[in-house]
Amino acid sequence: MTDKLTVSVLGTGIMGAAMARNLARAGHTVHAWNRTRAKAEPLAAEGVRIADTPAQAVQDADVVLTILYDGPAALDTMREAVPALRPGTAWVQSTTAGIEGVAELAAFAREHGLLFYDAPVLGTRQPAEAGKLTVLAAGPAEGREKVTPVFDAVGARTVWSGEDGAQGGATRLKLVANSWVLAVTAAAGEALALSKALGVDPRGFFDLVAGGPLDMGYLRAKSELVLEDRLTPPQFAVNTAAKDARLIVQAGADHGVRLDVAEAAAARMERAAAQGHADEDMVAAYFASFDEKTDS
């Protein structure tokens, strides 16, 4: 079969829009839908065909890619799309939906004869736009020739973790990775907040740890967003990070593990969102260290 596919992208937020662009640039026929159509319309300039409904978007699709806010949003969208889907269509489910959410989505796919791939991605706006995401994937071997060109267009690397997407092996790995990302993001914010409170130049702290085991590029990159007031457009937004943090906490609780750091990170993200930072980069959780909205 040709490696040029008809791909439907349902959800054109930060990640979905970038993925749709890269699929089109790779030569695939791309249809896109977003609940707020205006967010999808700029993709038309890249050759993406904008649909009015999920069902319209998935007509004649070889692969459907969902990348929406959460599991319920993905399920609701696929319920709208499924009347137009052919049995055997590959469904690449990249929404971070949590373990229970993935199981529910996989059951829906099974009911309607779809090939289900649990395929969350690692990366934020910049790697998404560059087509350099890491795709974490689990799903049946017999359909991988359909989804591999999609993964190659949006990512630099695909990590397979089994043949049963319903088990959520890829999502489980994503939750572990995100737990680390959230922990270091929260820690960076608190270090900056303490520096401000104590009158310490944070760049002096960066110099202190430079070249040692505590140094990391992520700390510097995220901190600069705060120090230079470059929190928009977000690489990954506070409100989405808060949602993912709660999925991590729930996954731990469901498996008998108490995740105090993830719980604290979730609370910080939620507090920052309530202060007005919901649509800023997740490092804006820095502001949760202060009782009132403050300048960085």
Give, region by region, the residue ranges found by the protein language model.
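Rossmann-fold dinucleotide-binding core
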Residues: T96-S179
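Active-site-proximal catalytic alpha-helix in oxidoreductases
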Residues: A130-G131, V135-A137, V159, E163-L198, ...
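Interdomain hinge/lid region at the active-site interface
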Residues: G168-T171, W180, Y218-A278
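NAD(P)-dependent dehydrogenase/reductase Rossmann-like domain
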Residues: G276-S296
